[in-house]
């Protein structure tokens, strides 16, 4: 099927690919439930609604039904440490699910699954709108397929906030690339209250603003590294906002095409010989040219460079952003950073404990928050106090190789900065466990970087999709199903 010229609307194609991938995940999830032993949450072979209620799904249910503890109800152990509580879970997803359950007088988990599926569909559309101008229609559809068939993608249809959070991030970046700053701010603020991603979001936007300020001053705009973020491809079929993108693309190509000298020569050679006509009269002798003036001629101004087509994403532009765009970008970054700090502030106000939010987040690991320390300790637990350091070094090298991939950089400056900031955020603050696979869903552009390489190689693409489905089977069995086989991990 030629997706570039298909009569089916592209968004419907995206939803079709998403639906097929999600239904495969649903089948795997339900089959995995048949092998699930008795757990803390249910008896063996749980029903679908019992199965989706495992792990942190219960915490979102508590947020929806009990809210957040105050200074009296905040759990504090005998050692003075804050215990596990709902402040670790942002409110928007839980309140949406709980509000829908009250409105319909329905089961909470039924409504939570509905919200998760809707969020997953929005995430597919948002990711396509973000990535399509950078990779084209065909590669973007393949990116949707690759992403939604990867192992932890099943979590996007379960009662977790991941699907809604990812949708808000993707939509925010998509509209920001089109200079819709106000809508981007709305999306990023909502995302900061859906998942704890406000810090890397604000950092990514702030670093991009600094980058653009340096480019505008000519400090890095001529570097080869900066040039590597400007794709040499213009995907005229990719703009998700302009209704006339095909006409705009044709106009842009026509305005930038060189003069066809061969055609001009051919037309001259086939022109009729006017001198053979009886009515031909000799031309008068040419006038003697006037002596050159002492005043040098004024040179004609150099032709202005061709403007980029309106559908070029803002962070792919080879030219620095305007001062107006940079100002709006700074405001967007500032608003996002403020949103990231608001939730810890609300926890402080409600509990009277300044570090209530951070203490809650670290309650699951049992130690205070220290940058990078969790990765060092975890590497020691996996490989030993000495050999584990080598494993940690390997993780850092692998991270550098992935983030330095040229194909990822060609998705745009902001896309690359976001992936770097979020990845570094996990390395600094996250306690590594099998949950890291779920956390890495936020660097979804990696799937589109892979898709660009595979879009013209159908066998390789099919192999990658098959591996993705296999990892979903392993994720359900090893991670979600709580010991259905010998390996016990947590989502």
Predicted segments with their positions:
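Short hydrophobic/aromatic helix or loop-helix immediately within or flanking a transmembrane segment
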Residues: 55-105, 371-376
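Membrane-interface transmembrane helices that cradle and orient dolichyl/undecaprenyl
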Residues: 172-183, 215, 219, 454
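Transmembrane-helix motifs of polytopic, lipid-linked glycan transferases
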Residues: 98-99, 111-134, 399-404
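Membrane-interface alpha helices of multi-pass inner-membrane proteins
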Residues: 148, 169-174, 182-209, 335-338, ...
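Membrane-lumen/periplasm interface segments of specific transmembrane helices
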Residues: 22-37, 204-252, 266-268, 309, ...
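Short acidic/glycine- and proline-prone juxtamembrane loop motifs at membrane-interface regions
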Residues: 158-164, 436-437
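Signature aromatic-anchored transmembrane alpha helix within multi-pass, membrane-resident enzymes
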Residues: 334-337, 456-484
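Transmembrane-helix signature of polytopic, membrane-embedded enzymes
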Residues: 107-111, 127-149, 167, 417
